[in-house]
């Protein structure tokens, strides 16, 4: 653990406190907590598997030539019969192959699909074309039957309400079914596999097969060594005990380490209604007696920090498709953050306490896009501090600040086993920010060759790119070995005059071991090549160990 941190814009002597308060670079606590060593993080698709097999056409002698006087369209009803006249009438004016009639049926199917009717189609039934009459059958698919297995538990009533909505839609649309499937994946504590079988009868009735599993309690932990000491963030989640789509998660940081860090957080969410609206609330508390010493010339200070945060929000799903989701979140939070600096050398009884009480509102939007070989995610957020409700801060930090932040990520699959992952992040602010609102880079957060709290600032950006390759085999305990290479970098800046920024740059090589279900163990060696690490003046390579597990 590093012993001394030199800060340039600080108090020159204890007597100067009245005229020039201490303004230290701080960190957003949650940015430096242990996190999983996963490529791309939350970019991976989470929607349940849904199969919609294509309807089979009857076998025909496609090259046989026929002469038709009339083509009858049976079934359907969503489109007027006249809709198909421009497509079918030319086939009655000349001799055609049966394959041309089948092609016309496929064109009608494409029209249904292009208009979003997921399991509707047209086909040419077996017939003898007697009297020069041909027939095309339209099947407008709708949900007729649901076969469920497994344990839906307390979610049974919610699922049945959604099913009734789908059954009422004739023909069934892709938009409704995909929204349903994504909403199902967002129910806390419910895991669902679904298969939608297309209609096999002329009435268009389709069968949906569902296999559900209700998991009320899950536990997990993330360990890493990037902070200088091994640390673990333990999580326990209770999901949908009452059937209201509620979830309560408790997180705890252990062991305290040399900095005597104590962090605990409670986060609660609950679905409101059946359309995906979600209420969110959270509370966290952090306190630490930091081992680092703040050095100003001959003076040394010890720092103790305490941070308490209360938050609330409303999640609004705007667009839910299997290939694209768009969510908007309205948020509000309060922060009570204090830092106490005790003079150690010279040994004079003196201390300074800085405190900020923030009242913040904000809005953020998240877009995720999924394709067969690519996944993308992007988010943009704006937060505004309020000069109200007893808000306060120590100059030059502003309590009525405005900050804008965002991130983007993209995963690309190259072949069957290779993957590339790009990540970018930024924060911008024109104001000097309180410690709790500043951006922090280092460790897994765009600075693998550095400790996780290497660089802070009012504004900055980070970027990384990873290439990995997976070796897969069948084994219960370990079935994936994934070596990877990462290059990352970051910049931070302060808006107050005289405070230096930071430049991070590092490269890392590592390997992940996993059973692709419960755990990921990561081992990597990273070397900085920009600023020197604050705990290593020689830019020596750093060994990082991470472990994440989840039960069940």
What are these regions (language model features)?
Residues 259-367:
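Transmembrane beta-barrel wall of Gram-negative outer-membrane proteins
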Residues 340-495, 531-537, 543-550:
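C-terminal outer-membrane beta-barrel translocator/porin domains of Gram-negative envelope proteins
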Residues 107, 179, 231, 263, ...:
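Transmembrane beta-barrel architecture of outer-membrane proteins
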Residues 224-233, 253-263, 455-458, 462, ...:
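Solvent-exposed loop/turn segments connecting transmembrane beta-strands
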Residues 215-226, 234, 245-256, 264-266, ...:
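Transmembrane beta-strand segments that form the barrel wall of outer-membrane beta-barrel proteins
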Residues 37-60, 64, 69, 75-78, ...:
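Outer-membrane beta-barrel initiation region
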Residues 192, 217-219, 241-248, 274-280, ...:
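Repeated loop/turn-to-beta-strand initiation elements of outer-membrane beta-barrel proteins
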Residues 236, 511-513, 518-520, 539-552:
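Outer-membrane beta-barrel "beta-signal"
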């Amino acid at each position: 653990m590093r012993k001394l941190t030199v800060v340039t814009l600080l108090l020159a002597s204890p007597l100067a406190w009245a005229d020039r308060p201490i303004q230290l670079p701080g960190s957003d606590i949650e940015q430096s907590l242990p996190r999983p060593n996963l490529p791309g993080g939350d970019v991976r698709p989470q929607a349940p598997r849904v199969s919609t097999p294509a309807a089979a056409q009857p076998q025909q002698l496609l090259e046989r030539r026929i002469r038709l006087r009339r083509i009858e369209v049976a079934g359907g009803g969503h489109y007027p019969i006249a809709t198909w006249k421009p497509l079918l009438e030319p086939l009655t004016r000349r001799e055609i192959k049966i394959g041309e009639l089948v092609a016309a049926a496929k064109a009608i199917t494409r029209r249904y699909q292009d208009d979003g009717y997921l399991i509707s189609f047209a086909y040419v039934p077996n017939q003898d074309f007697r009297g020069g009459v041909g027939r095309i059958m339209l099947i407008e698919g709708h949900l007729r039957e649901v076969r469920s297995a497994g344990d839906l538990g307390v979610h049974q009533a919610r699922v049945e309400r959604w099913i009734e909505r789908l059954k009422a839609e004739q023909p069934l649309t892709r938009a409704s079914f995909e929204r349903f499937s994504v909403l199902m994946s967002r129910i806390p504590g419910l895991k669902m596999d679904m298969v939608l079988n297309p209609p096999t009868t002329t009435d268009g009735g389709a069968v949906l097969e569902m296999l559900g599993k209700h998991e009320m309690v899950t536990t997990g932990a993330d360990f890493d060594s990037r902070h200088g000491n091994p640390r673990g963030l333990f999580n326990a989640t209770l999901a949908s005990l009452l059937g209201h789509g509620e979830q309560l998660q408790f997180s705890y940081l252990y062991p305290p380490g040399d900095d005597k860090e104590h962090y605990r957080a409670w986060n609660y969410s609950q679905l409101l209604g059946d359309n995906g609206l979600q209420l969110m609330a959270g509370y966290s508390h952090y306190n630490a007696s930091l081992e680092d010493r703040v050095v100003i010339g001959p003076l040394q200070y010890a720092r103790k920090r305490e941070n308490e945060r209360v938050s609330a929000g409303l999640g609004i799903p705007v667009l839910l498709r299997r290939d694209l989701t768009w969510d908007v979140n309205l948020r509000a939070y309060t922060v009570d953050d204090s830092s106490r600096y005790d003079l150690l050398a010279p040994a004079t009884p003196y201390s300074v306490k800085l405190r900020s009480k923030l009242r913040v509102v904000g809005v953020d939007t998240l877009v995720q896009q999924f394709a067969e070989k690519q996944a993308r995610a992007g988010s943009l957020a704006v937060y505004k501090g309020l000069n109200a409700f007893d808000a306060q801060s120590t100059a030059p930090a502003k309590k009525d600040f405005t900050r804008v932040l965002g991130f983007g990520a993209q995963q690309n699959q190259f072949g069957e086993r290779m993957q590339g992952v790009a990540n970018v992040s930024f924060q911008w602010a024109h104001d000097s920010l309180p410690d709790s609102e500043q951006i922090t880079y280092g460790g897994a957060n765009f600075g693998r060759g550095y400790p996780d709290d290497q660089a802070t600032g009012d504004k900055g950006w980070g970027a990384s790119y990873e290439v990995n390759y997976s070796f897969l085999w069948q084994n219960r305990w370990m079935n994936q070995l994934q070596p990877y290479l990462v290059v990352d970098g970051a910049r931070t800046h302060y808006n107050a005059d005289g405070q230096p920024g930071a430049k991070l740059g590092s490269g890392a090589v590592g390997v992940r071991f996993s059973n692709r279900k419960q755990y990921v163990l990561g081992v990597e060696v990273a070397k900085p090549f920009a600023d020197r690490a604050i705990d290593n003046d020689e830019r020596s390579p750093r060994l990082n160990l991470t472990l994440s597990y989840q039960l069940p």
